[in-house]
Amino acid sequence: NQCTNSDELEKVMNENKIRGYIGFDCTAPSLHVGSLLQIMCLRLLQKYGHQPIVLLGGGTTRIGDPSGKDETRKILSEKQIEKNIKNIEKVFKIFLKTKNTKTKPIFINNYKWLSKLNYIKFLREIGKHFTINKMLSFDSVKLRLDREQSLSYMEFNYMILQAYDFLELNKTKKCLLQIGGSDQWGNIINGVDLIKRHSSKQVFGLTTPLITLASGTKMGKTEKGAVWLEKNLLSPYDYWQFWRNTDDRDVFKFLKMFTDLKIEKIEEIKNNNINDLKILLANEATAMLHGKSAAKKAEQTAKKTFDKKSVGDDLPLININKGE
């Protein structure tokens, strides 16, 4: 989507093994498929010998990211944030390999350093690099103000703290790359600029597009609610069905984004029967999260239910009271 210097980044990554990070909000009890493209980016980094850093926003979640939001988020209790962090970590341990010491993911919580900041020192050393003029120009701030919606001073500071995260990871973990959704471009640029001004080091920022379905809706939720990457919140069968119900126009794109199939293989089969491709997508995506046997079982349940008009063993059941 966007990159601060794509040619130089490619050169650096070809010549060295680097560390790259993505920050994840911890406001929800787990992650949903709206975060899956970011997870796949970390998976790709690892696949090619680089080391992913998963930054868990224990500190910034206590403030709230105003990007793309129309109103101030509800502040969660510290206990709830810690519980969310543990659940989110579990998701990454499924998608990322944790055994190879050179590429295993580094999990780090930004509360570790944000909670220790001295306010006066922070303003003198970090705040001096940010101008109100520039901060007011970012969409996350501008849109809220243009709509005459309130933006707290706490939220206004979010972009500075995110930039500081990159500086901290660069200093302590030699991290050279931050990846995020396209709505994070302004925050990422702030981090790149801060490091350049603070230590004259070259680092990079890269964004991925926000995935919009062919229907025009944002990826991550359905009429039934969020498509969670957690079997206690969404059954493997329902997860399989989400992918099986992909719009025809999105199937080819999703096979490239959300499976480990090689591009050559996807190109080779792209003209196959669309329903066969949807089943392939559902099986590959479900196997990655829940395992091959769960994917196969979900497919068999769907076949029994829809082809043979019988009820499969793992079809989710809902109890309805007689009066309802």
Where are these regions (language model features)?
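Short acidic, glycine/serine/threonine-rich loops at helix termini
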Residues: G64-G68, L117-L123, T217-E223
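N-terminal catalytic cores of NTP/NDP-binding nucleotidyl/phosphoryl-transfer enzymes
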Residues: E8-P66, Q178-W185
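A charged helix-plus-loop insertion that forms the helical arch/lid used to bind
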Residues: P66-E82
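Short, hydrophobic/aliphatic alpha-helical segments
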Residues: E15-G23, L45, P52, A163-T172, ...
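Divalent-metal (Mg2+/Mn2+/Ca2+)-assisted nucleotide/phosphate chemistry catalytic cores
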Residues: S77-E78, N84, I94-T207
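Conserved nucleotide- and phosphate/pyrophosphate-binding catalytic cores
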Residues: R197-E324
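N-terminal regions that are enriched for targeting/export leaders
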Residues: N1-S6
